[in-house]
Every structure is written in structure tokens, then in C-alpha cells.
């Protein structure tokens, strides 16, 4: 499955992009929203990943943690498929507890915009996140060499319900492999949100080519 990343100023604009999109799931980046009337998203809830990314891991703006937690709580009243929260954030535990109460899936994420650590460190990160028992673990460092992709893709040998790939131009190949190995992967609906991100259409075409072989 492919999750299209929705970057919009409000829910109505997000809905318009979802209606035009051809993804299986849609990650709605509430950290980009300028207003928070979320009701228009309700009809699409079972296909939504709600993300309120903190600035330190690629968020569009700096939002106080208490405000982020309240936004997560409001968003979870929609009953989305998943919420995505960073493992290193102060509110991760509380978001996960609230999600379990509401029977909303949790993606626990880790992003590194500087590089890719050694495989042993990646395994420590994976094991630490898995110990928190999320529904999906997401690990996304940045590739500074082609070998960084190999380090990250090796994680699939040690975990299920894992989404792992590299950002950056050198990480594009790992994004393609993640579409084959992960429960879902991410692609842009329009302009790339993260370095090296493919569009939904581009990723679908590559997957068709691989399937044809």
C-alpha cells in the first residue's frame, strides 16, 4: 500500500487533495494546518494517518507539546486508521495511551535528517521502539551513501509491521524496496515533503514494472 502525504492549510483543502489522489492511505500533516476544524476529514477516517510532526523531526512549525497533545486528542475523535507520533517526543506515551483507549492504531516514528547510524545502533533504536508496543514502527534516517540503504533494509529481517527507508537522493532505492517489504510506504501527492520522496504515480509505475518482470 502507498500512503500519500497530504500537505494542506485546512481540512477542506486536505479533502480536495484526497478526492483527487490515487493512494491507498493518506497521511494528513496537521502541523501544516492553519485552522483545525477537522470534521470534513471524518468520511475518510479509515484511510487516514494523522501526523502532527514536531519541528525537530521535520515539522512545518514549532508547536508546544501540550498543544500538540491536545491536537492529537481532537484528531483521534475522528477514529483515523493511525496516528503517528515520534518516539523521542515528550508526549509519545500519552498519545499511545489515548490511542489505545480509542482503538486507533499507532505509528511510532524516528527520523534522522543528518545521516544513518551503524546497523547495531539502528537495531537498538528498533528494539527500544518495539518495546513500547506500537502497531507500526517507522525508522527513517538519511542516506549519505548507497550502503546506508542496505543497513536500513536489513532491519526488515528482524521485525514485522516495520516501515523503514532512507531519505535523500541516495535513499530513493530504499523507498522502492520499502513498498515491497513494509505494510505501506510513503509518497507525495504533489511536491515532495521529504528529501528524495517519490510521487504516488512514480512509485506505482515502478512497482508495475517490477511486477511485470
From Swiss-Prot:
- Which positions are annotated as binding 3-dehydroquinate? 27-29, 53, 175, 197
What enzyme class is recorded for this protein? Answer: lyase
Under Enzyme Commission nomenclature, its number is 4.2.1.10
Per UniProt, the keywords (alphabetical) are: Amino-acid biosynthesis, Aromatic amino acid biosynthesis, Lyase, Schiff base
Q: Which residues form the signal peptide?
A: none
Q: Which InterPro entries match?
A: Aldolase_TIM, DHquinase_I, Type-I_3-dehydroquinase
Catalytic activity annotated for this protein? 3-dehydroquinate = 3-dehydroshikimate + H2O
Q: Which GO terms describe its molecular function?
A: 3-dehydroquinate dehydratase activity
- Residues the record marks as active site: 111 (proton donor/acceptor), 138 (schiff-base intermediate with substrate)
Family of this protein: Belongs to the type-I 3-dehydroquinase family.
> What assembly does the database describe for this protein?
Homodimer.
State the protein's name.
3-dehydroquinate dehydratase
- State the organism named in the record: Thermococcus gammatolerans (strain DSM 15229 / JCM 11827 / EJ3)
Q: What is the lineage of its organism?
A: Archaea, Methanobacteriati, Methanobacteriota, Thermococci, Thermococcales
Amino acid at each position: 500500500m502507498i500512503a500519500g502525504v497530504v500537505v494542506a492549510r485546512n481540512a477542506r483543502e486536505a479533502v480536495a487533495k484526497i478526492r483527487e489522489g490515487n493512494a491507498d492511505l493518506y497521511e494528513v500533516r496537521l502541523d501544516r494546518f492553519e485552522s483545525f476544524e477537522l470534521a470534513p476529514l471524518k468520511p475518510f477516517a479509515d484511510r487516514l494517518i494523522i501526523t502532527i510532526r514536531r519541528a525537530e523531526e521535520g515539522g512545518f512549525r514549532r508547536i508546544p507539546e501540550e498543544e500538540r497533545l491536545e491536537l492529537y486528542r481532537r484528531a483521534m475523535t475522528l477514529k483515523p486508521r493511525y496516528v503517528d507520533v515520534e518516539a523521542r517526543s515528550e508526549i509519545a506515551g500519552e498519545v499511545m495511551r489515548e490511542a489505545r483507549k480509542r482503538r486507533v492504531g499507532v505509528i511510532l516514528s524516528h527520523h534522522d535528517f543528518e545521516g544513518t547510524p551503524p546497523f547495531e545502533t539502528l537495531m537498538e533504536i528498533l528494539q527500544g521502539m518495539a518495546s513500547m508496543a506500537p502497531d507500526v514502527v517507522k525508522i527513517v534516517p538519511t542516506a549519505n551513501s548507497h550502503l546506508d540503504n542496505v543497513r536500513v533494509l536489513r532491519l526488515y529481517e528482524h521485525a514485522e509491521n516495520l516501515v523503514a527507508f532512507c531519505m535523500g537522493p541516495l535513499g530513493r532505492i530504499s523507498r522502492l524496496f520499502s513498498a515491497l517489504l513494509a505494510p505501506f510506504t510513503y509518497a507525495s501527492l504533489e511536491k515532495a515533503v521529504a528529501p528524495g520522496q517519490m510521487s504516488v504515480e512514480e512509485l506505482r509505475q515502478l512497482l508495475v514494472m517490477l511486477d511485470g518482470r
